[in-house]
Amino acid sequence: MDKISKKRIMIAGRDSYFSYLLQRFVRTSAYRAIPVNLGDDVLSLAREEKPVAIVLEVDGPEVTGWHTLRALKSDPDAGRIPVIVCSWLDESARGLAEGADMYLRMPFLYEEFGAALTTLLGEDENGEHH
């Protein structure tokens, strides 16, 4: 397996359908998906797996996603990992203020997700730098 195909993207969500859809997209790209439930210790897993990016589902009054974002961004190691925050609500200002590197409002198309990864990582879904 070459170096590019080993790059991992952690998908942390509370909704299994959210994780399933993003895993499908990631499988068709140069990355490998690491699905994680928000109830799990996302911070420890991020330290262990060292993904190139984390996609984090947050949802309004649910504090789990926001708490996870703050924990990730305050950690000396995991804080360097770029995070895309996804929510059904228009909370982009909050997401960016809390430390997210990008914000996507759901629902979004695969193309929008791919464009966000390209912008965030400086490479397209095939792992080629731009």
Segments (PLM) and residue ranges:
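Two-component/phosphorelay signaling modules centered on CheY-like receiver
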Residues: 15-35
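Acidic, metal-coordinating helix/loop segments flanking the phosphotransfer/catalytic sites
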Residues: 37-53
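Conserved phosphotransfer cores of two-component systems
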Residues: 47-49, 72-80, 98, 119
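Conserved phosphotransfer microenvironments
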Residues: 56-74
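Alpha4 helix (beta4-alpha4-beta5 surface) of REC/receiver domains from two-component response regulators
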Residues: 63-67, 88-106, 115
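A short, hydrophobic beta-strand element within the central beta-sheet of small alpha/beta folds
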Residues: 79-90
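Receiver (REC) domain switch/active-site region of two-component response regulators
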Residues: 108-109, 118
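The C-terminal output helix
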Residues: 118-130
